């Protein structure tokens, strides 16, 4: 992980999950201020690295359990793409699910989270509230 975020631009695989409720709202996590990448910004509900030898589906289930405490959900793949910033380059496997159950954000990995309406997200785009990769995925896969 450290090597991938050091500015080496080493392409590494990650999983993302966009969690919608049945009202069409999107759950976003707030990144803790201590994170090295995009601290304090609102981001995709779940995001994490795929471990060596792990497949994307297993990585997604592990990350969702670790970050939000959700174990029973049905993911749907939206595709994959390469995201590149000044510090990193990721092969992102993008997924979505509809979930109305209890969400328990990890206090170790996240600074909380909440559901946003699509209109709230659209109004906040480009205002340095969200991570660049969330904004990219929102415009590419969701809006």
Could you say what each language-model-derived stretch is?
Residues 27-28, 45-77:
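The catalytic Nudix box helix
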Residues 9-11, 38-40, 87-89:
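A generic structural micro-feature
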Residues 1-3, 31, 82:
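Short clusters of small/polar residues that mark proteolytic maturation junctions
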Residues 2, 79, 86-143:
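Nudix hydrolase/Nudix homology domain
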Residues 14-15, 55, 111:
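Short loop/turn microsegments at loop-to-beta-strand junctions
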Residues 1-16, 22:
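Acidic, metal-coordinating catalytic segment for phosphate/diphosphate chemistry
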Residues 14-46:
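A glycine-rich, hydrophobic loop/mini-helix early in the fold
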């Amino acid at each position: 992980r450290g090597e991938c975020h050091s500015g080496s631009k080493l392409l590494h695989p990650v999983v993302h999950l966009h969690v919608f409720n049945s009202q069409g709202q999107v759950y976003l996590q707030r990144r803790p201020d201590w994170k090295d990448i995009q601290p304090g910004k609102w981001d995709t509900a779940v995001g994490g690295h795929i471990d060596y030898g792990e497949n994307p589906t297993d990585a997604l289930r592990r990350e969702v359990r670790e970050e939000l405490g959700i174990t029973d959900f049905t993911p749907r793949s939206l595709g994959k793409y390469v995201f590149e910033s000044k510090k990193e380059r990721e092969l992102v496997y993008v997924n979505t699910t509809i979930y109305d159950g209890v969400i328990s954000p990890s206090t170790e990995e996240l600074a909380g989270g909440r559901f946003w309406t699509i209109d709230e997200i659209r109004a906040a785009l480009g205002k340095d509230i969200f991570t660049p990769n969330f904004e990219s995925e929102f415009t590419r896969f969701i809006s």
